[in-house]
Design a protein with these regions (language model features):
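Intrinsically disordered, low-complexity, charged/polar segments
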Residues: 40-65, 107-121
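SH3/SH3-like beta-barrel fold
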Residues: 32-40
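Short beta-strand-centered aromatic/proline hotspots
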Residues: 18-31
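Amphipathic, interaction-prone secondary-structure segments
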Residues: 65-90
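Intrinsically disordered, low-complexity regulatory segments enriched in Ser/Thr/Pro
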Residues: 82-109
Length: 127
């Protein structure tokens, strides 16, 4: 992964052992290139991480519900809904603004990309 793909708080998976880590800091070291620090202070190289594919378990754990014909849906008190299409493995974020209905679409395949979209709606996810 590249440093410009990540934000603080993103979830990634280490290639060497499959562990999930949450990025707490991103920095560059001359001898190792781009690195990240996870919550326990351990430092790992970005070359040793990969994105986490979005799957059923992660979506259910984060409050999404299976809805026939739409895939997975999550709505909050502000009228925001997130629809995950089951037929093409893409995520579409639909946002309701006050009285007007506007659609803002963002297609994604990985957990960190979903985090970026949901952060804009002030929604955090867990792994």
């Amino acid at each position: 992964m590249n440093a410009n793909e990540l934000m603080i708080g993103d979830w990634v998976r280490r290639k060497t052992n499959g562990e999930y880590h949450r990025v707490c800091e991103i920095f560059q070291r001359p001898e190792h290139g781009w690195c990240y620090k996870e919550k326990f202070g351990l430092i790992n190289e970005l070359s040793d991480v990969e994105p986490i594919k979005i799957g059923h378990d992660i979506l259910i754990k984060n409050g999404f519900e299976v809805e026939d014909g739409a895939g997975y849906v999550r709505e909050d008190a502000y009228g925001r809904s997130v629809i995950v299409s089951t037929w093409d493995c893409n995520i579409k974020v639909v946002h309701n603004y006050d009285i007007e209905f506007n659609k803002a679409f963002h297609w994604t395949f990985h957990v960190h990309e979903l985090q970026h979209v949901l952060n804009a709606c002030n929604v955090q996810i867990n792994i």
